[in-house]
Amino acid sequence: MHGGVGHTDEGKLWGARFAGGPSPELAALSASTHFDWALAAYDLAGSRAHAAALAACGYLTDDELAGMLAALDRLDEDVASGAFAAAETDEDVHGALERGLIERAGADLGGKLRAGRSRNDQIATLVRLYLRDHAGVIAERLIALVDAIAAQAEAHPTTILPGRTHLQHAQPVLLAHHLLAHCWPLVRDLERLADWDKRANVSPYGGGALAGSTLGLDPLLVARELGFAASSENSIDGTAARDVVAEFVFIAAQIGVDLSRFAEEIILWNTREFGFVTLDDSYSTGSSIMPQKKNPDIAELARGKSGRLIGNLTGLLTTLKGLPLAYNRDLQEDKEPVFDSVQTLEVVLPAFAGMVATLRFHTDRMAELAPQGFSLATDVAEWLVKRHVPFRVAHELTGSLVRFAEENGLELHEVSDGQFAAISPLLTPDVRTVLTVEGSVASRAGAGGTAPERVAEQLAALTGRVRSLAARREL
């Protein structure tokens, strides 16, 4: 017993079974305090709940529980202030904090806290606590970004730009419609976080190393103390599963992809060739050698960091794919991808929101390009269909019109009445009624379309959905 305490003083939770300490090489490989210290506050919260569970089973007296909690509170304050930190000899956050507890409560009382729990159920629980907290932060920052995009959409209710497929001019659309198309994936990301929390809201505490405990501890008591709705149904699954972690990292990667797609457009729109936007000075950078440069660094970094987020997911899944039940030390490698994904999003999202909120759109340039590239060709084909021309024929006639215009350096509205008639008698002068981008946009008034009234309804629906999701998080 005393030998075990001696090893605990060194920041390790094992040792008596071994004749000597680990080699320096093993200690260096095994150490994790340089990254798992991020879980210190959650470890202390778990220790308080575990102490209460031990007291409920009679393993701590009321006085011992009070002394234990007081020591944990002092340790918590010292961790927060920086007065206590992990030492080089500490293997991980758990060992470091047990050392800190024993320094404050004494070896006899401090050494009792480990009864009935293992690092296996402990770490599985702490990661969920960490992720649930940070999921809330990420959700708030996602909402702020959606609000910034929606505000730009609301500020530009009539601006038209060329909609694109394959990066080619396709059909004119409202800028607001295009911007809102970037909001909905982010709303689904919010919904994914909310749905993920149903599975994360389960505590693995009480599973011990893998088989549970003989001490009669109540896992549900600890779960509720820590804010979980339930405890694990299976102690092996609780300690060994990391699908909840992988799911979170997937959501983070998906958010990164959604940001990256918008970032790519902002980068293009900011070029002189497009000329659709100007970045605010406070959200762009210059060049160390070219005085004229104004670079879209936030968009580029968001695009780059999406690859990092995808890499975190790929690395984590690769680590998990070959592990037999139950716990394996490989699972130590789940922390850094998780922490990195969280930290990346928590930095990228507010920067991206600020960039979007301060974008200045060049609506005249968008209006200039909107009818170009024969973007009204589909309107011509559908105008013919409304006159009972089979769509196959209408498609071919419109294709002939486009070829003629292209060969003669004309846009569709520049083709003369005589030239229309020469292409086909079906192309009467009335075809000009559909050769305006305003008319094209207004005519697409079906549900989900780009007509102004539909976009206004869409904006209201988006706002309601986001406010509902925000309210659910506050419950």
From Swiss-Prot:
Keywords: Amino-acid biosynthesis, Arginine biosynthesis, Cytoplasm, Lyase. Pathway: Amino-acid biosynthesis; L-arginine biosynthesis; L-arginine from L-ornithine and carbamoyl phosphate: step 3/3. NCBIfam families: argH. It is an enzyme of class 4 (lyase). GO terms for biological process: arginine biosynthetic process via ornithine; L-arginine biosynthetic process. GO terms for molecular function: argininosuccinate lyase activity. It comes from Leifsonia xyli subsp. xyli (strain CTCB07). Its main location: cytoplasm. This is Argininosuccinate lyase. It catalyses: 2-(N(omega)-L-arginino)succinate = fumarate + L-arginine. It is found in: Cytoplasm. PANTHER family: ARGININOSUCCINATE LYASE. One of its GO terms (cellular component) is cytosol. Its EC number is 4.3.2.1. Pfam families: ASL_C2, Lyase_1. InterPro entries: Arg_succ_lyase_C (IPR029419), Argininosuccinate_lyase (IPR009049), Fumarase/histidase_N (IPR024083), Fumarate_lyase_CS (IPR020557), Fumarate_lyase_fam (IPR000362), Fumarate_lyase_N (IPR022761), L-Aspartase-like (IPR008948). The gene is argH. Belongs to the lyase 1 family. Argininosuccinate lyase subfamily.
